[in-house]
Amino acid sequence: MTGRLSLPLSLRRLPAAALRILLPSTCALCGDGCDGVVCPPCRARYAAPRTACCLRCANPLPGGGTCNTCTDYPPAYDATVAAVDYGAPLDQLVLQLKFAARLPLAPWFAQMLADTVAARRGLALPDLLCPVPLGRARLVERGFNQALEIARPLAASLGVALHPALAERTTETTAQSGVSPAERADNVRGAFAVTDPDRIAGRHVGVVDDVMTSGHTLGELAATFKRFGAARVTNFVFARTPPHK
């Protein structure tokens, strides 16, 4: 049992246009009928482009640039692209994808990210993309890796090669949401390994995840890639939590 949502084989063989007729869609936020996951009015209201933020950690920063924290204590990653702020009602979509296996949300998350990338002038695309890996036990329990579900359509949209197994989680860490902020760095320290060092040496690696909270998980993964010779690491996350969280 994977927890994936799937259509009967007879429906999966139909063109997308036919499926839209047979399976009319409703907005995931307001419930009104629409052709996509989220209707245009809800997207404009709840998923408008983020205000100016730090180019490195994606925390709000009037005027943009790099925040004092990233200047004084540079994280291992070099840049972060975040499509939306993590808050109501979009936070419920993140939870539905992760814990209710509502996988059709993932391509919409990816499209929001791709739109954000397109709007960010001067952003260098990575040479390859990989998702933040789950531990084996959590992957078996959940049946899928939500970061990979977002990374697949994002890689296709950006025209960047996807390497799903570029890194692996070697330690079954406690979920960061269940750990105090002061303990989060220690919780993920040494949790990752690179499976193919030659593939990342001297290259720009893009890391995909659903949410960035403290940044410790992404920082540890970026540090792991840098130890194996990655030249640059950019995070691509659907949602960024406010600094106070």
Model features per residue range: what roles?
Residues 1-245:
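Glycine-rich phosphate/pyrophosphate-handling loop used in enzymes and phosphotransfer proteins
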